[in-house]
Amino acid sequence: MANLKEIRDRIVSVKNTRKITEAMRLVAAAKVRRAQDQVLKSRPFADKLARVLENIQSRVQFEAVDSPLLSKRNVKKISLVCITADRGLCGGYNTNIIKKVEIRYAELIKQGYEPNLILVGKKAIGYFQNRKDRYVIKSTFKELEQVPTAIDSEGITNDVLAEFLSENSDRVEIIYTKFITLVSCAPVVQTLLPLDPQGIAEDNDEIFRLTTKNSKLLVEKSNIEKNDSDKLPSDIVFEQSPDQLLDSLLPLYLQNQILRALQESAASELACRMTAMNNASDNAKELASTLNLTYNKARQAAITQEILEVVGGSAV
């Protein structure tokens, strides 16, 4: 059995570690709310943009419009945009998305395509750059804002557009982590190019709010109601031709799709970090309790041994 000093030092170390993990949990919890607020702020623009595109689509078939972002050509080269975090300590968040990319990459090769990677986040960059003999990397992006903004998505959008318009890629897919709940998220694959505009907000979207009760962190959730009262009127007249409108709107729509993926990934990362740090805090508390019990037993054994030695000495 370890001596009392070693046990006491370990108890102090575990308690200090618990303070750190608890602080990280609270910081992540606060940032999750910020990430969700950012999604809400960007949603009105995304919703309006989608409705304008839907209105144009109702008047002219996209297939008849001469826009390079809508053109569907024979697919040979496929770019995969992979979104991970810059940091760890977020459970299986980074591991799950990297596994999803590896599986998708292998599927495309098996089907006869030529995939390549556009990596976002230091974790993906570090992992795949160490395996350059197996993966083709086109470009990398790192050190984005913790709560992504349009500026963060602009650089990725420009790179994706350049790859597609130069025909270096015939299709672009994005692999990111979809935020479901504070304790649940899942890697998903979405086709970015060629574009196929559809609604942005879903009927069952939920927003999770962090509250406190009796000094404990709680989660409240509420459904988002889609507002159909501000739909564009059916008799609206566009001064420009559909081609001109789409050339202006489609890049914006693409950037918004990428921004949405970045925001969902950021919210998922923070939620995973909050959960991981919460589990770490609970484990540290349990370990400290076990060590305290061990310390008390060792101390009791030491006292008993001293008493026996005193009694034995007096008997002599």
Swiss-Prot record:
One of its GO terms (molecular function) is ATP binding. It is found in: Cellular thylakoid membrane. Its main location: membrane. Gene3D superfamilies: 3.40.1380.10, ATP synthase, gamma subunit, helix hairpin domain (1.10.287.80). Keywords: ATP synthesis, CF(1), Hydrogen ion transport, Ion transport, Membrane, Thylakoid, Transport. It is a peripheral membrane protein. GO terms for cellular component: plasma membrane-derived thylakoid membrane; proton-transporting ATP synthase complex. Belongs to the ATPase gamma chain family. Produces ATP from ADP in the presence of a proton gradient across the membrane. The gamma chain is believed to be important in regulating ATPase activity and the flow of protons through the CF(0) complex. F-type ATPases have 2 components, CF(1) - the catalytic core - and CF(0) - the membrane proton channel. CF(1) has five subunits: alpha(3), beta(3), gamma(1), delta(1), epsilon(1). CF(0) has three main subunits: a, b and c. This is ATP synthase gamma chain. The lineage of its organism: Bacteria, Bacillati, Cyanobacteriota, Cyanophyceae, Synechococcales.
